[in-house]
Amino acid sequence: MPDMKLFSGNSIPKLAKFIANRLYINLGKASVGRFSDGEISVQINENVRGSDVFIIQSTCSPTNDNIMELVVMVDSLRRASAGRITAVIPYFGYARQDRRVRSARVPITAKVVADFLSSIGVDRVLTVDLHAEQIQGFFDVPVDNVFGSLILLEDMLQRELKNPIVVSPDIGGVVRARAIAKLLYDTDMAIIDKRRPRANVSQIMNIIGDVANRDCILVDDMIDTGGTLCKAAEALKERGAKRVFAYATHPVFSGDAPKNLKNSVIDEVVVCDTIPLSENIELLPNVRTLTLSGMLAEAIRRISNEESISAMFEH
């Protein structure tokens, strides 16, 4: 069996370290930095010939820098004769640009990034809760999309919830919310019907379902500016919800997210560590982070040993 090696870019070193600790190995020795003109500099400082290599790198903000850093690391390892290279991308940037809207003259950037990674020598991709599952088909290499939402579910099950109801923040999230509701004591589900006049701005229109005197659990794959989430929470409280908890895998938290969450009526926001939090977010008392290091470490172990990934999620 080839020797497993784990390398990390600069996007999410804390999670990479946690994963390495779970696997009882050290992170690979590599120098990943910048030249004086801003170009990315990578040097692999140990032998990787024939090794089964995993690179941990979220393509979060600064998205373009982190993508290029991943690409240059892949090329460095390929030229150093690594046996197999798996890109572990906990958060896959550009995933929301996965289609053309009404024949607009826009790119499908998720496909562009997938083609880029497939063409430069990545043998496999491991990611978490893709914004759209069809993105797996954009790649010309195998993609394992693991479910971080199950880590969130474990936290929900440990809460002392009173008459809970799972809420989808939009129509597109109904499948995700229904799956969580079924696993959460087969509880009821509500849907928030909203209209979005422009990017990152939404208007709550209607709540489908009775949320009065219930603990509401908003579930989504990511939180960006938090505007949608905070307005959803306000609408739920106006309809008589007792408490509102928000769960999301990816804490993008861009723009006015710190201000929005600080001033929101949400009782607690729970996210995973696929993206590092800014200091402004970390200081908020109503934001808590769960680690995916155990799940990702097990997925990496299974890939390296040629074992089933889907078996991790069979109930």
From Swiss-Prot:
Protein residues bound to Mg(2+) 2: D170
Protein name according to UniProt: Ribose-phosphate pyrophosphokinase
UniProt cross-references to InterPro entries, sorted A to Z: PRib_PP_synth_CS, Pribosyltran_N, PRibTrfase_dom, PRTase-like, Rib-P_diPkinase, Rib-P_diPkinase_bac
Gene: prs
NCBIfam families assigned to the protein according to its UniProt record, in alphabetical order: PRK01259.1 (NF002320), ribP_PPkin (TIGR01251)
Free-text cofactor note: Binds 2 Mg(2+) ions per subunit.
Phylogenetic classification of the source organism: Bacteria, Pseudomonadati, Pseudomonadota, Gammaproteobacteria, Enterobacterales
Major enzyme class: transferase
Active site: K194
Subcellular location per the Swiss-Prot or TrEMBL entry: Cytoplasm
